[in-house]
């Protein structure tokens, strides 16, 4: 059984499709079991937060990265957490 991996997803998305469409580049670090789940997470995240349709999101590159290569310190620290108690 494979563990959770980190993926660096790069691409472009069309923001504001109805009013003033603007194509923007994005880079997102995603925790997932495989590439397919990482892509699905990106689609669902942009769809729910920014109301962007899946056909307006173009993923150009997806690559697996090591925990040490993550640029954001907060994400690196959260990766070390084994369990969360609420």
Curated annotation (Swiss-Prot):
Disulfide bonds: none annotated. The keyword Ribonucleoprotein applies. GO terms for biological process: translation. One of its GO terms (cellular component) is ribosome. SUPFAM superfamilies: RplX-like (SSF160374). One of its GO terms (molecular function) is large ribosomal subunit rRNA binding. It comes from the Archaea. InterPro entries: Ribosomal_eL20 (IPR028877), Ribosomal_eL20_dom (IPR023573). Keywords: Ribonucleoprotein, Ribosomal protein, RNA-binding, rRNA-binding. Part of the 50S ribosomal subunit. Binds 23S rRNA. Belongs to the eukaryotic ribosomal protein eL20 family. This is Large ribosomal subunit protein eL20.
């Amino acid at each position: 059984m494979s563990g959770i991996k980190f993926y660096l997803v790069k691409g472009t998305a069309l923001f504001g499709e109805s009013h003033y469409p603007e194509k923007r580049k994005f880079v997102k670090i995603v925790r997932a079991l495989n590439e397919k789940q990482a892509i699905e997470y990106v689609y669902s995240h942009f769809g729910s937060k920014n109301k962007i349709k899946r056909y307006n999101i173009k993923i150009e590159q997806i690559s697996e990265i090591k925990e040490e290569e993550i640029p954001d310190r907060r994400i690196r620290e959260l990766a070390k957490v084994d369990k969360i108690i609420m």
